[in-house]
Amino acid sequence: MTKPIILTGDRPTGKLHLGHYVGSLKNRVFLQNENKYKMFVFLADQQALTDHAKESELIQESIGNVALDYLSVGLDPKQSTIFIQSQIPELAELSMYYMNLVSLARLERNPTVKTEIAQKGFGESIPSGFLVYPVSQAADITAFKANLVPVGNDQKPMIEQTREIVRSFNHTYHTDCLVEPEGIYPENEKAGRLPGLDGNAKMSKSLGNGIYLSDDADTVRKKVMSMYTDPNHIKIEDPGQIEGNMVFHYLDIFARKEDQADIEAMKEHYQRGGLGDVKTKRYLLDILERELAPIRERRLEYAKDMGEVFRMLQEGSQKARTVAAKTLSEVKSAMGINYF
């Protein structure tokens, strides 16, 4: 029986943080280890260039860092094909063919793109590559005939646009060579969008309000101890608010089942007064370190031989290119432009 295919990835614009870990990485490792799927995981450097065109050095540096993060959380190149987007030229060619099937108006209506354009403050200077990156994503997904794509809820419009492109292509060229993907969305809304340590709506590399998978134990401790709690909880005996308190928000996400009773008791104690923020932060720190310590240890080990890390990426890219080339050939045959 053929295994369903999963495609997932990240933009290499910096090291990955806890938001990436609970939002996608942890689930990827789970899906990989279930051994029910054929996994493709990629570093979307071409997509990163759509809004970092003048920061190619950052992207180059981030390739190695993100690869280390992948390996340290448990992604295994023997079980998952890990590759670099720019090393698969077939993806760019597929994008060109798909762009002929999507109107500019449709691209401009994509809610995800509209939101990101506003957030990035492009104004009238929107890079054309950024505007069409949903088409590039469709090429990434369809090149590997992915059945399933794990994404955040904010990416639903991107999946739908890919499905539209697939239907349009298959209808236009009377073929079924492209596969309509389904999105896999987070069940835990809190985990799907982890807030920053400062209470900002999202943990973000650009805002510097996150805990990175590469942070050492002392850095993690300092960041946890500076987390946003209840600004009105000045004295230990004061009643405290749980809502909007990042320490309790993180506890809800990272705690295991066996921790739940203790956390509920802490919440009640905090709300009636008599429990200080330092104690709750230390409790959270222990829980985070339980998760981060083995990741940190593996990362340090892999970092000793970056040559081997890049050999892994090269081998994965070669494997991925073979698959993408086969799909491209099928696409060109359907279009009637496979001349030789």
Curated annotation (Swiss-Prot):
One of its GO terms (biological process) is tryptophanyl-tRNA aminoacylation. The keyword Manganese does not apply. A motif ('HIGH' region) lies at residues 12-20. ATP binds at residues 11-13, 19-20, 152-154, 194, 202-206. Belongs to the class-I aminoacyl-tRNA synthetase family. Catalyzes the attachment of tryptophan to tRNA(Trp). This is Tryptophan--tRNA ligase. The lineage of its organism: Bacteria, Bacillati, Bacillota, Bacilli, Lactobacillales.
